[in-house]
Amino acid sequence: MDSWTFCCVSLCILVAKHTDAGVIQSPRHEVTEMGQEVTLRCKPISGHNSLFWYRQTMMRGLELLIYFNNNVPIDDSGMPEDRFSAKMPNASFSTLKIQPSEPRDSAVYFCASSL
């Protein structure tokens, strides 16, 4: 086996706890083997109808991946390739999936919500 087989992808997630921000994201940290599926979850602030998924890397800075309004994707132009997908089946829950994960996916991922 080559060294890539054992390469791990580190995905750090910025999580807002039960504070004024109110957005809940899980898991807090995710480390996975290359090729595995990663699912990030976000619960927006109750009553907010817009949800945003972001990715931040040292090389590219902050990037908007996808934006939902009333559970409908409005702008997904930042979603890289076909390995990334996001859903918002209802107003209280969204997921961001990466499958299969690759080393270049290492970043800080976070979501935000607004009225």
Curated annotation (Swiss-Prot):
Coiled-coil intervals, chain numbering: none
Assembly mode: Alpha-beta TR is a heterodimer composed of an alpha and beta chain; disulfide-linked. The alpha-beta TR is associated with the transmembrane signaling CD3 coreceptor proteins to form the TR-CD3 (TcR or TCR). The assembly of alpha-beta TR heterodimers with CD3 occurs in the endoplasmic reticulum where a single alpha-beta TR heterodimer associates with one CD3D-CD3E heterodimer, one CD3G-CD3E heterodimer and one CD247 homodimer forming a stable octameric structure. CD3D-CD3E and CD3G-CD3E heterodimers preferentially associate with TR alpha and TR beta chains, respectively.
Family matches, as Pfam families: V-set
Gene Ontology CC terms: plasma membrane; T cell receptor complex
Protein role: V region of the variable domain of T cell receptor (TR) beta chain that participates in the antigen recognition. Alpha-beta T cell receptors are antigen specific receptors which are essential to the immune response and are present on the cell surface of T lymphocytes. Recognize peptide-major histocompatibility (MH) (pMH) complexes that are displayed by antigen presenting cells (APC), a prerequisite for efficient T cell adaptive immunity against pathogens.
Entry's localization field: Cell membrane
Annotated keywords: Adaptive immunity, Cell membrane, Disulfide bond, Glycoprotein, Immunity, Immunoglobulin domain, Membrane, Receptor, Signal, T cell receptor
Cysteines paired by S-S bonds: 42-111
MF terms in GO: MHC protein binding; peptide antigen binding
Main location: membrane
Protein's UniProt name: T cell receptor beta variable 12-3
Signal sequence residues: 1-21
Domain Ig-like stretches: 22-115
Sugar-modified residues: 90
Swiss-Prot/TrEMBL GO biological process terms: adaptive immune response; cell surface receptor signaling pathway; immune response
